[in-house]
A protein has these predicted regions:
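Proteins with a high burden of low-complexity, intrinsically disordered sequence enriched in S/T/G/P/A and R
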Residues: 17-18, 22, 49, 56, ...
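C-terminal segment of N-terminal export signals and the immediately downstream linker at the start
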Residues: 6-40
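Short, amphipathic alpha-helical segments
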Residues: 2-5, 46, 76, 89-91
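N-terminal export leaders
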Residues: 1-15, 109, 135
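A generic secondary-structure signal for well-formed alpha-helical elements
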Residues: 8, 17-18, 45, 49, ...
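Short, charged, low-complexity loops and linkers
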Residues: 20-28, 46, 64, 68-72
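Short extracytoplasmic
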Residues: 28-58
Length: 164
């Protein structure tokens, strides 16, 4: 446990001391590590909801774009917390120890990502459960905010407000 704490502190120091300052424009974007993490968890969280076949990649990319847009609309303090979460998950030693995902995110198996999400969802630690909920809500909000998903749930779309 002390080793995990040391890794977390080391990663925090690395990101606070050596990370380049973020601008307003870059605050709206997810970095490549965060995009890779979300791209790995989207198919697991949305299993059974995402289309299969050739439409699957496009649906995942649209969901990733929706997540990016949703995160950009969050208050700066929440975006900073998400940045810290994604930095923790992107850093190989903490990804392995805290998430149990041994491969880089783009190469992670569906099973290892599902196990990671399940462990965090059911963790006795409130912080891990909160992190799971944040990722889960971002992905679900991005997917169900996408018109591609509406037909599958019987939602006809927003009503027309046209007068006349």
């Amino acid at each position: 446990m002390a080793g995990v704490a040391a890794l977390v502190v080391a990663r925090w120091l690395y990101t606070t001391v050596s990370a380049p300052p973020r601008t307003a424009a870059s605050d709206a974007a997810l970095d490549s590590d965060a995009r890779a993490i979300l791209a790995a968890i989207i198919p697991v969280i949305l299993e059974g909801a995402l289309p299969v076949g050739s439409d699957a990649a496009a649906a995942r990319d649209e969901t990733l774009a929706g997540a990016r847009e949703a995160i950009a609309g969050l208050p700066p303090s929440v975006r900073r917390e998400l940045d810290q979460l994604f930095a923790l998950l992107a850093f190989a030693p903490t990804r392995c120890i805290v998430a149990g995902v041994w491969s880089p995110w783009p190469d992670a198996s569906r099973e290892s990502v599902a196990a990671f999400l399940g462990h965090w969802r059911d963790s006795r630690f409130a912080l891990l459960r909160s992190a799971y909920e944040a990722m889960h809500q971002i992905v679900l909000g991005a997917w169900y905010g996408n018109p591609r998903s509406w037909g599958a749930i019987g939602y006809p779309g927003p009503p027309s407000l046209a007068v006349g």
